[in-house]
Amino acid sequence: NDRVFYFTTCGWMMWNWLVGALSSGATILLFDGFPMYKKNDLLFEFASEEKVTLFGISAKYIDTLNNNGVIPKNNHNFSKLKTICSTGSPLSEDGFRYIYNNIKKDVHLSSISGGTDIVSCFVLGNLSQPVYAGEIQNRGLGMDVDIFDEEGSSIKDKKGELVCKKPFPSMPIKFWNDEGDKKYKSAYFEKYKNVWHHGDFAKITGNGGFVIFGRSDTTLNPGGVRLGTAEIYSVVEKFKEVQESIVIGQSWDNDIRIILFIVLNKGYDLTSEIKDKIKKAIRINA
């Protein structure tokens, strides 16, 4: 009786993921168009009218709703809704709290993470375990997922590289026109011998869950200290003055310095006071 919806284009792997729900006998629902056309909660209106039981969106969409003060539960009936899935980028602790406070308090929130190349999830939700804000609950079935340090040792409660130590059902077996599998091996097995290196910067928490900090190739390394871009975005996005932001690492004086670009909301100027507030918040929380 499940009715599954994930907002996606046909070009994203979540389209394939959504079609896969048919194999379990579920009904799938599609939405074509801009998800905030004329109203911020358009997708929730769709979910309510179509009696969706699993509702899937991106973490960025949740952040946008939160920043705009949208409270979907005030206008829509979510009596059929059992699960909300989030992917595309790390869902912040604030995002978790927003969902439970403003959408539905007794829903199962499943933050999931995998990849287009595997059309699957390495880590995802689990109905038999508690949900902790900011964490992905557990490994996927058949996925021997771990976190390695730079030397290839397994680590807990420390940031490192997300890996899968054994073959798994949905891994690609080769690249097209890749003589000798050189590109394939370079993409996944060059960093750790015979271990799939996925390129996510993450950690395993004391609860046994996972926190994803962003892609390893976007990880900043000022002064030799690794810092995920998601850690900075989660701080900056809380400022009412900031509409959009992007952070990069720039080579500088034999090191890396962090450069933050921001777009302010209407009515605000980039004053010294705003700069200092943002810098202080990043220093304390990231």
For the regions a language model picked out, list residue spans one by one.
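Conserved AMP-binding/adenylation subdomain of ANL enzymes
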Residues: 1-3, 10-53, 68
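Adenylate-forming
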Residues: 9, 32-35, 52-98, 110-117, ...
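Short, well-ordered beta-strand segments
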Residues: 3-5, 162-163, 261
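Hydrophobic alpha-helical scaffolding
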Residues: 7-8, 33-37, 50-55, 85-89, ...
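AMP-binding/adenylate-forming catalytic core of the ANL superfamily
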Residues: 48, 55, 168, 194, ...
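Conserved AMP-binding/adenylate-forming
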Residues: 48, 82-209, 216-219
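Residues embedded in well-ordered beta-strands within globular domains across many folds
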Residues: 5, 56, 82-85, 146, ...
